[in-house]
């Protein structure tokens, strides 16, 4: 396997608002998979209404200062990478994931209902409560 870069290109959302809150960058750190995770090289990502609604603070009725402008009802930490709909190839795996998964084509389920086998009180969504697919890796 080729060594992965330390940084990637992507689009950071820097706050709630219009398109001026999207910042195209080439210095976003590449995520490192933890023990139970995989790292995906993004092949394609679509703009979902969730991406737009999150950016414009629609979930908090347009109050851009609201602390509940996400699916989970908690404040979004900025900057973040949006992109709820994403597919690609697995390029790295955590220590608890079979290396046979590397190279596998995947379509990501964006709704996270559990983390490390424990149910979440509210679901979290890729590109909202955690970084999504508007970057080279997720």
Question: Where are the regions that the model predicts?
Answer:
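Short N-terminal binding/cap micro-motifs at the start of the first secondary-structure element
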Residues: 17-23, 49-50
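Cytochrome P450 core scaffold surrounding the K-helix E-X-X-R motif
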Residues: 50-56, 117
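Eukaryotic N-terminal low-complexity, Ser/Thr- and Lys/Arg-rich leader segments
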Residues: 1-8
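Short, Lys/Arg- and Gly-enriched loop/turn segments at beta-strand edges
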Residues: 113-123
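Glycine-rich beta-strand-centered segment in the early N-terminal region that forms part
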Residues: 29-46, 58-115
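A structural motif shared across PLP-dependent enzymes of the aminotransferase-like
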Residues: 114, 128-138
């Amino acid at each position: 396997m080729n060594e992965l870069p330390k940084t990637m290109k992507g689009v950071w959302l820097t706050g709630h608002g219009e398109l001026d809150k999207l910042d195209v960058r080439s210095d976003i750190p590449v995520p490192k998979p933890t023990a139970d995770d995989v790292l995906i090289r993004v092949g394609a990502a679509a703009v979902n209404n969730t991406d737009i609604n999150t950016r414009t603070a629609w979930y908090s009725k347009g109050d851009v200062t609201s602390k509940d402008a996400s699916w989970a009802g908690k404040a979004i930490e900025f900057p973040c990478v949006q992109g709820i709909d994403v597919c690609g190839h697995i390029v790295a795996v955590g220590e608890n994931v079979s290396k046979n998964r590397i190279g596998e084509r995947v379509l990501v389920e964006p709704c996270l209902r559990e983390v490390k086998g424990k149910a979440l009180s509210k679901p979290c969504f890729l590109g909202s409560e955690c970084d999504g697919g508007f970057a080279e890796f997720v």
